[in-house]
């Protein structure tokens, strides 16, 4: 991807498997950790991944701390409504990104992609699902911004068969852009030819 001239969005899930609003399970290696240990583990892992990708010349143009965090991360400690813990974990990831970026700009990381020379700051995105649900975004980001580190972008998932109409998405984006003063990105989207849930078609035969 880097050789082709594209930037890379580094998406950190903080789980042994894909994480989304229905499953935000801690890695097995972290299962016995308390809140402070989880916070440190997020920081250490994020910094390690930043070093790994930067040292191997990957053109990181954005970092996503967690995936679809609508219901939190690192359950059960970081499950909504435990916003103090959610903020602690997300903040740890953001701080690690900032630390690695400081090292990149200082020239202390070798092998950094030349395409990143003009990038003054690697932006951080926080990503929720259900892009048409304004109440969700207000509740989540109202709570996080009282406790959280600074970040640059809000990411939204939008699947119309789950997340409402385009008008609902537009209204939500207009509201949160003004309310939080962040850039927005639709991080996941699928516009199918039907509004029916595809789960109805997953089992086509009895065999």
Regions found by a protein language model. Give the residues of each.
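Short, well-ordered coil/turn elements that cap or connect secondary structure elements
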Residues: 3, 119, 179-181
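Short glycine-enriched loops at secondary-structure junctions
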Residues: 12-18, 66-68, 190-191
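Hydrophobic faces of well-ordered beta-strands that scaffold small-molecule active sites
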Residues: 8-12, 61-65, 124-126, 152-156, ...
